[in-house]
Structures are given as C-alpha cells and as structure tokens.
Amino acid sequence: MKVGKSYTLAEFLAWTRRKIYVLLVMAIIPVVLYKVFGQTWIAAPWSVAVLLGTATSFIVGFKNAQTYNRTLEAQQVWTAIAGTSRYWGLICRDFPTHRASAKVLIHRHLAWLTALRYQLRGSGRIWETVSSRSNQEYLKTYSVPEKETTLEVELQKFLPESELQRLASTRNKASTLMSMQSEAIRELYARQELVVLHHTEMQKTLKDFLDQQSKVERIKNFPYPRQYATINTFFVWSFAALLPFCMVREFDRLNDAVSGVFVGNMVWLTVPFAVLVSWMYVSLDQVGESSENPFEGGANDVPIAQICRWVEIELRETLQETDLPRLLSPRNQVIL
C-alpha cells in the first residue's frame, strides 16, 4: 500500500516506459509512411478514432472499477479479521478458568494470521502481474515481509515443536491451525474449563475466522475474468495502433495555418500527441491490471503484514506481555 501523498510523474513514466517505447514506434511508422513515402491513402477517418476511443474508455473504466472493488473487498475482509481477532483475544483471556490457556489460544491464533498471509503472498498465480518486468523493477524499491523470512521461522515464535511438526505435512496450514484451535476448545470444555455458553461462543468465532479465510482465498484463487481482461487489452492496443493513422491528416491540414520552417512539417506533431493520448489509455489499463490481485506483493496490495503486526501487538498486550514487536516501517512510502 502506498502511504505517501501520491506517486510522482517520474515514477509513472519509469513504470510505463517500456510501453511508451512501443507507442512511440507505433506513432512514427504511419507518419513516415505518410510524409516520407507519400502514402497518403493510409490516413483513416477521424470518426474511427472517436468511436473506438469511446468504446475503449467504457471498457477500461469498467475494468478499473471492478479491480478496485476486488481490492476494496480484500481490505474489508482483513479489517473484519482484525476486529474479530481483537474479540478473540478478549474471550480467550476471560472465558477459560485457567489463564494459561489464554496464551496458548492467542499465540496459536497469531500463528493462523501468519500462515494465512504467507499463503496469500507466498505462492504466486499464473495470472498475477507482479512478475512482469516493470513490476519486478519497482519491487526493488520496497520490501515484501513474506519474501524476507520463511513461514517456518515466523511460526516458531508462536507454536511448540509438536504443533510445528504436525503443520509441516499439511497443505493448508491456516485451516489446520483452525482445526487445532477447535480441538483445544473441545478439550477445555471436556476439562470443564469452559461453560457451555462460552464454548459455543468460541466455536462461533472460529466459524467467523473460517468464513473470512474463505473470502480472502476466493479473491486470491479467482482472478478478474480473463475474457474481460483480454478484450480490454485488445481494445486499448487497437486504439493505440489506429490513433496515429487518424491523426496524420488532421495535423497535415495545419500546414495551411503556419509559415516558415513549420510549413510541410506539422504532420510530425502526430507522434507526440498520439503517444500522449495512447499513453493515457495504456496507463489506465496497467493501473487496473496491477490492482487486480491485492495479495500478490505489489505496491498497491492490502497491507496484510502490517495489519497482522497491529493485531499481534494488541493481543500480546492483552496477555500483559512486554517484549512486543515494532510496527513495520514503510520503505519508499510503500508498506505491506
């Protein structure tokens, strides 16, 4: 998540520069054909650019709205996880008759948060864009906590060796930890450390956590529909390719209104203006593409590592622990 005021124009230009190079070539070719080789027949009617540009605007706007909704939903689910975690800390402290049980339950919950965020960020999907050259280049300017330490090292802070060994052979470690929580609550109830009402409430809270886990896993595992993403790319690049052909004749007509060295050369203005207009569409498409997957480790991700750190500090304060970790610090105004 970007925590600065805004991205700078220099960052945007550097991030999109490879596409700018392509747009530049696409704009120069029709101008050279028109001006140097005299192929004036290649000029297309301006109405073609208007119609295609309008259609492209609608589909790009639709895509960006939908990808923003995915990020917003991810943020809302993690906000719910944080709120339910605070409640979990309170009932673990107050419901069991022996306070020692609270520490075990809370630390296992912190392990669940850790396993969940590693599952979301630790494994990529083929449709994710963080592996693109532009995103990989920008990735060097900020930190992804899940790439700096392994899950096993993080889990050692919260779990005994026996539980770590049990987790080692499981595929979905977050779900396994929820299963272990349910078993622990059942044992507390069997030992009469929980009354029926408290046992029921704790099981209900575990169900809430499982529901929230399923929601973020759905966002992770179900991409923005590929048919919409594909047609969006076709529209954007078709518009970028045709725009210079529609502009050359319009700029050539400006020769009648100028004098001196500009006479006969106004058509070359097609290149910068075509690149500028096309770049706006291509950049909007790239922004939407980079926002599709809020758990891939991109600069616009939901800051799940920071949310987990907030929850960890608060829950360990509930246990009156004093050796607390610090909040994560942003790097290059990005925090994840």
Where are these regions (language model features)?
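N-terminal juxtamembrane/topogenic regions of multi-pass membrane proteins
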Residues: M1-S85, D94-H98, D256, F262, ...
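Short, surface-exposed loop/turn segments at secondary-structure junctions
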Residues: I42, T71, F95-K103, V195-H199, ...
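Bilayer-spanning, highly hydrophobic alpha-helical transmembrane segments
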Residues: I231-E250, V275, W279
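Cytosol/matrix-facing amphipathic helices and coiled-coil assembly/linker segments
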Residues: H109, T176-L188, L197-K220
